[in-house]
Amino acid sequence: MTLQHDALRREAPRSDRVLIPRAIWLLAAGMFLWGFGYGLHTYMFPVYLRSIGCTPSQVGVVFSVSMAATAASCIPGGVLADRYDRRKVILLTWLAGAPSPILYYLARDYRMAAVGIALYSGSLLGYPALNAYAASSATAGASGAAFGVINVGFAVGMIASPLVGGRVSDVWGPKTVFLWSLAFFLAASCVMAFLPPERREAKSEAAAGAGAAAGAAAGAGPRGGGSGGYRGLLRDGSFMWFIAFYSVCAFAYYMIQPLISQYLADVRSSSMQAIGMLGTLMSLGQALITAVVARAADRRGTVVAVGANLLVFVVSLLCFVLVPSPAVTLVCLFLLGGFMAGQGVVYAGVGEILRERADGKAFALFSLAMSTVSIFGPYMGGAMYARSRGTPFYLAAGLVAVGGALLVREGIAIRSGRGGGLAAEQIPGRPDSTTI
């Protein structure tokens, strides 16, 4: 009994000494550069659209197009992730999305801006491959930390870049910012060219002669069983509830995401440089909160950690709208960065529920649901904002509160063995699995 206990202790990853593979660090480096380029323009972008004559509803249309393009990319992205070399899929899709700032530069109205953002969001075709690659490359039992490191890389890249973008905009004009973004996007794509082969893919190839296959490399075509395809995923009740609860929260967030900077400009009379500074504060919050959520995910469970983080987001959002104090606004913006912090870690929840059945299709289905329900969110938010500045924020807070609470409940059930991947072990016919 003692020997068995000691063996289990040796197998369990030490929370204070988690090994982060080289592949994860390279993904984080690429995400840092991409995040820097994205942060240069993202917070000023809605205000820039207003400056070229777009109405709040038209700004909403642009962001709705973004969500539609993201949704359209999910299923093909899942197929690509499971049929082809994930490293090549990641590299090619990043290169495809890099030129999008050029279209922002050329935009004279919301139409060209919508084309540009469709190109950017369509390049998320490679996101299922990136998530599946990260899941298969992560140290066993530390997927929360791995996804956290990747998301922190992106968030850290966005900390200083909004300030830089605001300064560049004031000195050389907002269009120059888009050229800077292009340069950083291309640099980030170059980093992706150095990704190593997947560790679990190599293991599955070695085991193929004996008739075994690694679950994390499973899927369509050459990758074998895995999730059992989209039909198998749709029959997994815990996974479907997880998708539904988080999708409600995503809809609410993307409904108000383009409104935050507009609210600062319209209601708080903030300048472009001030909006960039406040965007930096949100990015700092995203980076620091990601570390907290990732650590909590590995200790308490991803679904519970993400759900609890969403409840903190709700309180911050309400205070942001209801309390006009500059000091409170600063604190709230820092905490509002927590939504994207949780979104960077939530993909580890796919592995927590499905375990080694989590393949490219599983990540694609999760992204598809989240993006599809969010398509009309930005447009609805813009239409409501044109009539009442506070209404979309109150609605978003209510939806996230419900979704976050239900996620906490679902996560507790998963950890206690009443649902998700743990319960799946009790169901005959499902492949045996271990925690990612």
Describe each region flagged by the PLM.
Residues 3-21, 198-242, 425-432, 436:
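Juxtamembrane intracellular "pre-TM" segments in multi-pass secondary transporters
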Residues 17-67, 240-241, 245, 250-268:
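Helix-loop boundary and gating motifs at the non-cytosolic
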Residues 32, 111-125, 328-341:
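Hydrophobic core of transmembrane alpha-helices in multi-pass small-molecule transporters
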Residues 67-75, 125, 158-159, 283-291, ...:
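Residue-level signature of mid-helix packing/kink "hotspots" within the transmembrane helices
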Residues 74-85, 169, 290-301, 385:
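Helix-to-loop junctions at the C-terminal end of transmembrane segments
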Residues 88-102, 182, 304-318:
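Structural signature of the two symmetry-related core transmembrane helices
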Residues 303-343:
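C-terminal transmembrane helical hairpin of 12-TM major facilitator-type secondary transporters
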